[in-house]
Amino acid sequence: MLDIQQLVKTYENGHQAVKGVDLAIHQGEFIVLVGPSGCGKSSILRSIAGLEAITSGEIHLAGRRVDNEKPANRDIAMVFQNYALYPHMSVYDNLAYGLKNRGVSKATIAEKIAKVAKTLKIEEYLDRKPAKLSGGQRQRVAMGRAIVRDPQLFLFDEPLSNLDAALRAHMRLEIKKLQRELGVTSVYVTHDQVEAMTLADRIVVLKQGEIEQIGTPAEVYHQPASTFVASFIGSPAMNFLAASISDGKLQLAGKQWSVPYDANLNCNTLTLGIRPEHASLHPVDDAIELSLNIQVVEPLGPNQLVHGKINGEYGDEDFIAVTAEMPLTIGDNLPIWVRVEQLHLFDEQEKRIPISAQSPSVDTHQQQRQQQ
């Protein structure tokens, strides 16, 4: 439906914001572009909209090349972070403005606005000016202005970043429900990984103008392609421990475990990734055992974050575990278990090494030698 081919965007100062991005988006799909500031996500969105002239590449919408067309001719509607409403116009006139410019009849405009206002629950605001609306109400109006145009593609440029946390959570649900009802292909830009996880059919993680990974929220979370993706998606972020692997044995904190791997791998500078919520306080089968020296406990109500140090391959390293709420003593060593199937291995280039679940075995002979 939307096909981006080898998109490059270089600014006049020589900065290349987008570096040959390829992306195919299906009809009705909700795609979220996510990444830190400067990753190129907004440049891609503005290039699709026609607000930025691309340096090279092609953009096709429904089989039609649009990168050489004016923004008004692309059949795309955009929802901005700052709402972009006309302050001197009523909500009704803001909704009607684009349709009037296209020569749509008054009767058709009234019909479209009535339908959209009912869908977005803004009927009672139609006579008000934007200044009389709350942030959430303004965002609904901005979305309504995009919807009445009946475009082939919706673009969302960090639309919730000006709202408080509670309203953001509510509006996330509103946007997701609305997109499902309308079935319009949508591209959404955010730096917030929670928005990405909750809204997207597929997430596109960007780093320095290039795509680091494309996948469903579950794929990106459970099979991150790199340490960058693993650290960016998930809160608290994934823990990383320096480890090594030799002859099929993972070496960490003076212990060895047999772990499955796809190739004959020997690596002296492996990175082991562990999600904080995968640290169990009870022995489990097919797991490695570590010892967490407790330094800080953050109670969150239903659970708590336990911050501490774990003895890694090259010294103590920071680690966070999510546990049930319970009394813990600062300075104590807390034994934790992590299932092998929940471990993430990354190579020297910080790229994922695929592994599958298999029972680990502690090399007791080496432990005995170290104890002697």
Swiss-Prot record:
<comment type="similarity">
    <text>Belongs to the ABC transporter superfamily. sn-glycerol-3-phosphate importer (TC 3.A.1.1.3) family.</text>
</comment>
<dbReference type="InterPro" id="IPR040582">
    <property type="entry name" value="OB_MalK-like"/>
</dbReference>
<dbReference type="InterPro" id="IPR008995">
    <property type="entry name" value="Mo/tungstate-bd_C_term_dom"/>
</dbReference>
<dbReference type="Pfam" id="PF00005">
    <property type="entry name" value="ABC_tran"/>
</dbReference>
<dbReference type="GO" id="GO:0016887">
    <property type="term" value="F:ATP hydrolysis activity"/>
</dbReference>
<dbReference type="InterPro" id="IPR047641">
    <property type="entry name" value="ABC_transpr_MalK/UgpC-like"/>
</dbReference>
<protein>
    <recommendedName>
        <fullName>sn-glycerol-3-phosphate import ATP-binding protein UgpC</fullName>
        <ecNumber>7.6.2.10</ecNumber>
    </recommendedName>
</protein>
<dbReference type="GO" id="GO:0008643">
    <property type="term" value="P:carbohydrate transport"/>
</dbReference>
<keyword id="KW-0547">Nucleotide-binding</keyword>
<comment type="function">
    <text>Part of the ABC transporter complex UgpBAEC involved in sn-glycerol-3-phosphate (G3P) import. Responsible for energy coupling to the transport system.</text>
</comment>
<keyword id="KW-1003">Cell membrane</keyword>
<dbReference type="InterPro" id="IPR003439">
    <property type="entry name" value="ABC_transporter-like_ATP-bd"/>
</dbReference>
<dbReference type="InterPro" id="IPR015855">
    <property type="entry name" value="ABC_transpr_MalK-like"/>
</dbReference>
<comment type="subunit">
    <text>The complex is composed of two ATP-binding proteins (UgpC), two transmembrane proteins (UgpA and UgpE) and a solute-binding protein (UgpB).</text>
</comment>
<dbReference type="Pfam" id="PF17912">
    <property type="entry name" value="OB_MalK"/>
</dbReference>
<keyword id="KW-0067">ATP-binding</keyword>
<dbReference type="GO" id="GO:0005524">
    <property type="term" value="F:ATP binding"/>
</dbReference>
<dbReference type="InterPro" id="IPR012340">
    <property type="entry name" value="NA-bd_OB-fold"/>
</dbReference>
<feature type="binding site">
    <location>
        <begin position="35"/>
        <end position="42"/>
    </location>
    <ligand>
        <name>ATP</name>
    </ligand>
</feature>
<feature type="domain" description="ABC transporter">
    <location>
        <begin position="2"/>
        <end position="233"/>
    </location>
</feature>
<dbReference type="InterPro" id="IPR017871">
    <property type="entry name" value="ABC_transporter-like_CS"/>
</dbReference>
<keyword id="KW-0997">Cell inner membrane</keyword>
<dbReference type="GO" id="GO:0015430">
    <property type="term" value="F:ABC-type glycerol-3-phosphate transporter activity"/>
</dbReference>
<keyword id="KW-0762">Sugar transport</keyword>
<dbReference type="GO" id="GO:0001407">
    <property type="term" value="P:glycerophosphodiester transmembrane transport"/>
</dbReference>
<dbReference type="InterPro" id="IPR003593">
    <property type="entry name" value="AAA+_ATPase"/>
</dbReference>
<dbReference type="InterPro" id="IPR027417">
    <property type="entry name" value="P-loop_NTPase"/>
</dbReference>
<keyword id="KW-0472">Membrane</keyword>
<keyword id="KW-1278">Translocase</keyword>
<keyword id="KW-0813">Transport</keyword>
<dbReference type="GO" id="GO:0055052">
    <property type="term" value="C:ATP-binding cassette (ABC) transporter complex, substrate-binding subunit-containing"/>
</dbReference>
